[in-house]
């Protein structure tokens, strides 16, 4: 699963997801892509599940690019813990995704195969997505 090798700070604020994505919203590498239509935190497990599903379906043919990286730590407090005594410990990593962001790209395969592979990956995502073709 994806996670940063090292970070400057162990914990982060939750932040807000306002507006649309202005970065990473164009197809750069492949010919087909999966675009997010809603804002969400996508965990490293979900990213990996989508990548595996696409790889399995496409088999040897084609190439896959993962265009998002989980760089935000999410902290969780132990269950049945009283309030106070600081912030919880980092549990998992998420990628902050805004509408319009490209999640995955594929190339070197036919459109039918790409559409099916990307739809399988889309079912693993916690948000509504859209299949897009470059050009």
From Swiss-Prot:
PROSITE patterns membership: RIBOSOMAL_L16_1, RIBOSOMAL_L16_2
Record key words, sorted: Chloroplast, Plastid, Ribonucleoprotein, Ribosomal protein
Record text on subunit structure and interactions: Part of the 50S ribosomal subunit.
Lineage: superkingdom: Eukaryota
Stated family: Belongs to the universal ribosomal protein uL16 family.
Protein name: Large ribosomal subunit protein uL16c
Presence of the UniProt keyword Plastid in the record: yes
Gene Ontology MF terms in the entry: rRNA binding; structural constituent of ribosome
Organism (species): Platanus occidentalis (Sycamore)
Cellular localisation: Plastid, Chloroplast
GO BP annotations, alphabetical order: mitochondrial translation
GO CC field: chloroplast; mitochondrial large ribosomal subunit
Main location: plastid
HAMAP family: Ribosomal_uL16 (MF_01342)
Plastid recorded as keyword: yes
InterPro entries, per the entry: Ribosomal_uL16, Ribosomal_uL16_bact-type, Ribosomal_uL16_CS, Ribosomal_uL16_dom, Ribosomal_uL16_sf
Cited Gene3D superfamilies: Ribosomal protein L10e/L16
